Structure formats: C-alpha cells, structure tokens
Swiss-Prot record:
Species per Swiss-Prot/TrEMBL record: Danio rerio
Gene that this polypeptide is encoded by: sh3bp4a
Protein name per Swiss-Prot or TrEMBL: SH3 domain-binding protein 4-A
Intracellular or extracellular location(s): Membrane, Clathrin-coated pit; Cytoplasmic vesicle, Clathrin-coated vesicle; Nucleus
BP GO annotations: cellular response to amino acid stimulus; endocytosis; negative regulation of cell growth; negative regulation of cell population proliferation; negative regulation of GTPase activity; negative regulation of TOR signaling; positive regulation of autophagy; protein localization to lysosome
Key words of the record: Coated pit, Cytoplasmic vesicle, Endocytosis, Membrane, Nucleus, Repeat, SH3 domain
Origin organism lineage: Eukaryota, Metazoa, Chordata, Craniata, Vertebrata
Length: 965
C-alpha cells in the first residue's frame, strides 16, 4: 500500500518521498483529526506552504554556500536557497525543510533572514544601530518586555494548513498558534502544552512581527500586521543600554545587556526568594565575595534550576562524557573507561623501551547522523581514542560489550565495528573484529593520533517495508537523574540511551537571558534499567511516587519520546517536576518509572529509591565550635538500632574460663620483646586461647599460644607448653587475671597506632546512640552536656562528637600530670560499653594505616608478598599521587600503600583476625622485615584474639537485644 502511494505521488510529479522520515499524506483527499494521530512527523505534502508563509514556528534562513549531503538524514541545498528551520537544539546541526523534504543542515552554511532579530544566529554583528536618533531608539528597542500584550493576528494559512491547529499530532510544533501568540495571557484555551523535551530548544522570543516603521523590517516568520503590533511597538523602551553605545554588539551580548536593564520575570519555583547578591548591597568587596559564595553554595545544594536564572524555562541538559587518560610504557597494560565495559589492551613492546605513550579514551553518547538510518543502527557509544606517541611497533585491541543480538531466523544483519578519523565520519568497517557472545574485540592497526570507533548493526538488504530493526534484538537504557539531596521542590531527568553506557552525572545549564552567569548543576544517576525495544516508536514515560506527600507534575506530552529520536540514536531527555505537599515533612521515597508503547502496552518499569534529604545541622553559635569542624557531619545517618541500644554494665570479676599448661623449657631472650614471654621450666601458665597463632620468631616461623604468666600477657611457643586442662593448679604463681587487668594488658599497643581523627569521629557518630553512656565510659561521670559543648545540640551524633572532642583535648593537654593515650582511652570506653564490633573495626583501620606509614617506601615489596601485585597494578596505585614531575614524594608514599592495603583487606573478607594475621605474616616474609623493630602489630594480634574472652567474662548474660552492635 505504502509503495503504491509513493509511486502514484512520484508519477504525478507532486512530491518525492522524504528521505529522513515521515508519512505521505494527500491533502486533497481530506485529512481528519483522527487520521493525523498516526502521523509521527510532518509529511512533505504538509510542507507545501506559500512562499510567504513558513511552517508553524519555523524560522526562515538562506543558504550562503552549497552543501552536498554525506548521508540520507542531511538535506541538500545550494547557495541562495531558502530553508525553514524547525529545531536548533543540535548545536552544529539544525533540522529544517525546503518545502519539499526535511533533514539536518549545518548551521554554518546558512544565515537567518533579517538576522538582526534572528534567534538562530549568535555570531552575527548588528551594526550602525547606535547611530540612530532618540526617536529611532524608541521604535527599535526590540528587546523590551511585552508583558500583558496579547497578539492574535489572523494568519492567512490558518484554514488551509491542517497542521496549524493540530500540534498534538506534530512533534515539530511547539504548540498551537494561539499558545505561541498568547503566551502572557491568563485565559488560555484548554489545549495540550508543548512537549517538554530537551531534545528541542524552544524559541527565545514568543513571536516576531513585521513593522515598516522607519523602514526597518523585523520578522521571525511573516504574518499580517494587526493593531496589536502597533501597541507592542509603542511599549518599546528607550533606556536600553544597547542604544547608548556606538559599538556593535553580538546577540549574546544583547541578551546580557537586556538582562541588566530589564527586571527578571518572577520565578514560579519553590526557592522563589533565592537571588544572587549585587555589589551595590555591600560596603566592601570581601562582604560581597562571602555573600556570593554562600548564594552559589545554596543554589547548588538545592538544585532548583529556577534559582540559577530567572528564566522560568528548563535548562539545556547534556551528559558528562566519561573519559580517562593513562600513560603506558613498553610493558603494555590495559586502560578501562570508568563505570563502563569498554577497555583497551596494549601488548608488551608496543613502544620502545624507555618510551611512553599517553592513551586518552572518551565515550561520546550522541552518535553522528551517518551511523543511524534504515540500514544501520549504533549499539555502543562512539569511543574517541587519542594517542600521543606514534612511534609504535604493534596494534592495540579495543574490547567492549554490546546489548544487542541479531535474529537467527533472518540472518540479514550483522554486527560491525566501524572506524573514522573524524567524529562526523565517514566511517569504514574494521576487518579485524571478533565477537564472543556479548563481547566484541577489535584489533586496531594503522593507528592515528585521533580515532573514533563504534559498534553498529548493519542490514545487508533493506526494502521499503523493513529496516535494520527487523533483524536485531536491541536493548535501550533508561536512566533516572536527580539532585544529591531531595528538597520540597526539585526536578528529575529521565534519559534514554541507545546503548548500556549511561553517565554517572548530567550537567544542567540554564538557557535564557542570564545563562552566562549561571554555573551548571550536576545531577546524579539514581538508577538505570535496560529493556528490549523491537522497533523505533513513540514511548510514553510515566513517573509515579509511592508516597502521597510527593506529587509528580508532568503533562502528557512531556512524557513522550518520539520514535524518530530513538531511530537517530540521540539521547532523549524528559523532565519531571516533583514537589511536596507538606514541605516540613520531607523524607526519601520510591519513584516508579513506567514505559508504554503507542498501543498503551507496558514495555518496562522499574523502581528507584531517592536520596535522603539534606541532614539538619545543629544550632549556629558565634562562639568557637570545636565539635562541628569536619564535613563528615553531613554524611551521618544514625542507625535505628543504635538509637534504642541499652549498653550493659562492665563487670569487674576474675576470669575463670581458662586452660592451664606446664612449661617444659626455660626461655630467656637476648633481644627483648614485650609481646613474647620469658619463662622458667616447670612453672604453670594460663592459656587465654587454644587457637594457635603462626608467626615468625627470632629465626623462623612458629606456632604460638596466648598465655598469662606472672602478671603479663604474651606469646609462648606451642612446643614449650604441656596443656593440663581447666583445673587451676594450686602452685600457680602470680595474681589472678581479672577483666580490668586483661583489658589494660591487651590495649597496650593501641597507643602506638596511627589514626585519622575525622574517620574515627564519623564512625562513632554513625554507630553510638547514647552520648551519656559514652561519657560515663570515658570517666566523665554525671557531667552535663554543657561541659562538652557551648550550645544545646538537637542531634545525638553531634553530642557524641562533642564528647569525643573533649577526650582529644584532654589527651593532648600537656599541663595535666597524668598522660592519657587517645587511642587507648577510646578503645577502653568502647569495650566497657560492649561495642566489640566497633573496636574491631577501628583497630583494623588503625593497623592498615599504621602499616602503610611504617612500610611506606617499601610498600611494593609488601604488595608482592601479600597479593603478587604486578608492576602495572603498582603503577596504577601510585598514579593518583604523582606530582607534576611524575614522581611520588617520599613523604606521600604512604598513600598508595594505604590504597593497596584497603583494597587487599576488602578481598580477604570480613574477619579482622584473618586480615591482621595475614598482614603480619606478609610483613614477616619481607627482606629485613619491619616487624623486627616495630613489634606492636604482634600486640594488636593478641588484642583481637582476646576480645571474645573479655566479653564473655565482663558482661553478665542478657537478651541479645540489649547488646550494642
């Protein structure tokens, strides 16, 4: 049927078929509203307008040079041709028609008609207007406010053009003509609003009219002048700074000058009163600088775009392209794009010995037009590869995963990797491409300094009734973006990608008069979902909240993504305004995103949990605030379990759950070690644990018991002890072991461990739910809260932090007679509160940091002993800490060591005993091990192995709910 209509149309010499997309419609047969519902884009017949009338809100331009298209989606034209631009959001490429067909045109090849008032040109200069008279300035102040003006000219093509009043069926029209002309009127007809898609850039001015006053003509699209035109011209202002200078201004400068002279429109957002300060409001520059920084911080935190610019429209949004830069030597290696499945493998000997090559990779999310048409469709981002050193000896391999499969029942398409030296093409297939399941490996030779590589599905044959989508199963990705914290009113963005590479952030910039003064806002990826899309079609994206307090505001057309956008592979974005009915009751909630096709069938849906609202800080005080210095306060979320915790009472009692042994050898050590016991043959020793610890002694590795001998706790060689049993011999020498004595003995090595105070503070604020119990355990008994801080605090975590700050001050006070160790006092208090898990976590953090500091210049040796880390991996650990000369300073060498130890400990597992034990053994295997001079890691190992014994002895049996976690 479609082919027959095309042939009839062509034989009658009426119109050729549109090359990019569209449905053929014969206007003479009559078009009803119902029949136009199925129209995806304007047909060529609908574009046969009179020369003096353009298509809806299209802007007329003239070609200044010839252009021959390189793909079917672009439009061919010659110098002097008149074109009508429908969409300018593409930047370098505009979407236009020439009364015969539609397609993309390069913006640099055309010039707007009457470009002195054109919204399409930002580089043209407006000359000689500064020389006009005062009367001319009155009539030519084209940028004045038109508030209250209602323009409804009678357009000559209203009755003849079926598309002029059917904006709901035409994705290229921003709205009905009445909506455009009566933008400021309070009484608007009940019609569908314009599609709130960031894929299109709405015109900056509501309408342009034609005036012959003083011989000047200003037109966006021609129409019949009415009395409203004259009323509008009488409202033009003469105090515009544009007319006060003799120089020429670009349209960008005009928008800035107009923003300075005209008061901005009132914002309809939640943060209505948030306005940038002006220098005139302050007496000195420093006060203005402080106020400006505070405003900027507040504006970025609330993420309300209307606070960044007074234009009530939504800003232009673009994804942050994922990129990485790495330098490799002759040993080769691998470079992977962060948060993607895209990597480059460089073989050994790729460059000469002593040379290096810098490799830069970037994922470009919007593919060029050449790669998406009826025959071809991209299934990966375009990967930009830049190489610095071209003196190479081998090829490199690009590996990436794709979310597509070709249909086995119709082998008419294949997955192809294409390459080009330019972003816009032309692209040619890469022969050395190998596919393994969903992974494709590409062998790149004939390397260039800059290359662009993409994976596409290409159909071998295309007919009028089928395209490449009929021969593949393709997945698209839906990403939901929003601010870091939710607020009573905020905006979210739903983005659709033609591949599985969704960026972690979206940058949002305000589009309007004050766009240049507004910094971009970064929206974070809340969640993403993949689903199979059988063909390019209109998708209805709905968003729903699971809480009645939050309302999602979006009209029906703002929920639609057009099929031709998906076909072109462009990133489509939808905006949803979410507001709270009760601004004082804000909490996180769940958003459900639902995708429906044009038949109202559900294709996919998924749920995303929103972030938390920003935490409330304590009362501000002009006095010194020693407990709110760190940024970690904003990250504290107190566990619900910690709030209801009842901390048990530490009991002073003798430890009875012990085994005893007889020493069968006398040991006197020449090199003293406070954690290795000295003993006499025939004496009795108490064994705190039957578990054997494998450590290196003076010469070789041995197995050890933890023993208690004559008031001292330490290690004893297993072969030197004959285990007797649990009955205490009568000739046992030394004092009985009590819980307090055990705690004092095992906490001795804590004072020699290195710690980061901010990290300790954060962990305690997150896990302690009772500042009173914490203060009592630190011997601050019955002291009021004002003893620790100067202001009353509403937050329990901040109260805990104030007690911790007081402990730190007392330990660092040099005037006190009794010297205290911060680490030991803290651990003792936590053990008295039965927070054994918290002690184990802090001890492991202290041990890893202390080891990194002690072993800093020799950390590579330790990494090789612990995990057999390769040279390339070691370089990767040091890369973030190199200075401008490419070297890691000796004083900063602990940083890569700490990064490695954290990664290694996470791979070992959750057992803090195993981590410390394996670390000790790894240090023992080093050449000239540091454990020979630094003995306190041995004491720490004794500590973590005695925690269970201490807890079972110091606390009476109680229900599990009464213990702290």
């Amino acid at each position: 049927m479609a082919a027959h209509r095309i042939r009839v149309t062509n034989n009658n010499n009426v119109l050729p078929r549109c090359k990019s997309e569209g449905t053929l419609i014969d206007i003479d047969e009559g078009v009803t509203e119902a029949s136009l519902v199925d129209v995806k884009v304007p047909s060529p017949s609908a574009l046969r307008l009179a020369p003096s009338t353009s298509f809806g809100t299209a802007r007329e331009v003239v070609a200044i040079k010839d252009y021959c298209p390189s793909s079917f989606t672009t439009l061919k034209f010659s110098k002097g041709d008149h074109l009508y631009v429908l969409d300018t959001s593409g930047g370098e490429w505009w979407y236009a028609h020439n009364n015969r067909e539609m397609g993309y045109i390069p913006s640099t090849y055309v010039q707007p008609i009457n470009y002195r008032n054109s919204s399409l040109s930002d580089s043209g200069m407006i000359d000689n207007l500064g020389d006009c008279s005062e009367e001319g300035a009155k009539e030519l102040d084209l940028l004045g406010e038109w508030t209250g003006v209602c323009l409804k000219p009678s357009l000559p093509y209203d009755n003849n053009n079926p598309f002029s009043m059917l904006s709901s069926t035409n994705p290229f029209l921003n709205g009905s003509m009445d909506d455009v002309l009566d933008q400021n009127s309070n009484e608007k007809p009940n019609q569908c609003n314009s599609m709130d898609l960031l894929f299109f850039d709405l015109p900056s001015a509501p309408i342009s009219t034609t005036s012959n006053t003083k011989g000047y003509s200003i037109s966006g699209f021609d129409g019949t002048s009415t009395s409203a035109d004259l009323e509008a011209l009488q409202m033009l202002r003469k105090d515009n700074p544009f007319f006060r200078s003799k120089r020429s201004y670009s349209l960008s400068e005009l928008s800035t000058l107009q923003a300075q002279s005209n008061p901005p429109l009132p914002s309809s957002g939640f943060f209505t009163g948030l306005k940038a300060p002006s220098p005139e409001q302050f007496q000195n520059r420093e006060d203005f600088r402080t106020a400006w920084l505070n405003h900027r911080k507040l504006a970025r935190s609330c993420h309300d775009l209307e606070s960044l610019g007074q234009n009530p429209g939504w800003g232009q949004t673009q994804p942050v392209e994922t990129n990485i830069v790495c330098k490799l030597d002759s040993c080769g290696g691998a470079v992977q794009l962060p948060d993607t499945n895209i990597s480059i493998h460089v073989p050994e000997g790729h460059v000469a010995v002593g040379d290096t090559q810098q490799i830069s990779m970037k994922a470009l999310l919007d593919p060029p037009l050449e790669l998406n048409n009826d025959r071809c469709s991209t299934v990966s981002p375009v990967v930009e590869i830049k190489l610095s050193n071209m003196e190479i000896k081998s090829f490199i391999t690009l590996e990436m995963k794709v979310s597509v499969m070709t249909r086995t029942e119709s082998p008419m398409a294949e997955i192809v990797c294409v390459r080009s030296d330019c972003k816009e093409g032309p692209y040619s297939p890469v022969p050395q491409a190998y596919i393994y399941g969903d992974t494709i490996q590409v062998q790149l030779d004939n390397l260039e300094p800059c290359m662009y590589v993409a994976v596409v599905v290409q159909a071998k044959h295309v007919s009028f009734s089928s395209n490449v989508w009929n021969h593949m199963v393709k997945k698209v990705t839906l990403g939901l973006y929003g601010p870091k914290h939710i607020h009573p009113s905020f905006k979210t963005v739903v983005a659709i990608f033609g591949h599985d590479c969704a960026p972690k952030t979206l940058l949002v910039s305000e589009v309007g008069k004050q766009a240049k003064s507004a910094p971009p806002v970064s929206l974070q990826l809340w969640g993403k979902h993949q689903f199979v899309l059988s063909r390019p079609q209109d998708l209805q994206i709905g968003m729903y909240s699971n809480m009645s307090n939050y309302e999602v505001k979006a009209n029906d057309q703002a929920r639609v993504v057009r099929g031709f956008q998906i076909k072109l592979g462009k990133v489509s974005r939808l905006i949803y305004m979410i507001s709270s009915r009760k601004a004082d009751e804000i909490s996180d909630f769940t958003l459900r995103v639902q995708v429906k096709d044009d038949q109202d069938c559900i294709l996919a849906q998924f749920c995303v949990q929103t972030p938390q609202p920003p935490p409330k800080t304590g009362m501000r005080n002009n006095g010194q605030r020693r407990f709110l210095k760190k940024k970690e306060v904003d990250k504290i979320i107190l566990s619900p379990l910690a709030i209801t915790t009842k901390y048990p009472q530490f009991q002073e009692r003798c430890i009875t759950n012990l085994k005893f042994g007889k020493l069968i050898k006398t040991v006197i050590r020449q090199t003293k070690n406070q954690y290795l016991l000295e003993y006499k043959k025939g004496d009795i020793i108490a064994l705190l644990s039957e578990e054997k610890i494998k450590l290196k002694g003076q010469l070789w590795t041995k197995e050890w018991y933890i023993g208690y001998y004559q008031g001292k706790i330490g290690l004893v060689h297993v072969k030197n002890v004959l285990v007797l049993g649990k009955v205490k011999p009568i000739y046992f020498c030394g004092p009985d072991l009590t819980t307090t004595m055990l705690m004092e003995q095992i906490l001795k090595p804590c004072k020699f461990l290195t710690y980061i105070y901010a990290s300790v503070r954060t962990i305690l604020m997150e896990n302690l739910g009772n500042w009173r119990a914490f203060a009592d355990a630190l011997s601050y008994v019955n002291l009021p809260l004002t003893y620790f801080c100067r202001a009353e605090l509403d937050s329990e975590p901040e109260r805990v932090a104030s007690v911790l700050e007081k402990l730190k001050e007392d330990c660092l006070n040099m005037e006190t007679k009794e010297k205290k160790s911060f680490q030991k006092e803290l651990m003792m208090a936590l053990l008295k509160m039965d927070c054994q898990g918290l002690v184990a976590r802090l001890i492991m953090d202290f041990v890893l940091l202390t080891t990194a500091v002690e072993v800093a210049p020799r950390w590579r040796d330790l990494a090789e002993k612990l995990a057999h880390v390769s040279k390339q991996q070691m370089e990767a650990y040091e890369a973030p800490h190199r200075d401008k000369t490419g070297m890691v300073d000796s004083e900063a060498m602990w940083k890569p060591a700490y990064d490695f130890l954290l990664t290694w400990a996470a791979q070992i597992g959750d057992s803090y005993r195993d981590v410390i034990h394996e670390l000790h053994m790894g240090l023992d295997r080093m050449k000239n091990p540091i454990t020979k001079r630094w003995k306190h890691l041995t004491g720490t190992l004794i500590l973590v192995n005695c925690l269970d014994l201490l807890r079972s002895s110091a606390f009476s049996p109680a229900p599990q709910d009464d213990f702290a976690i």
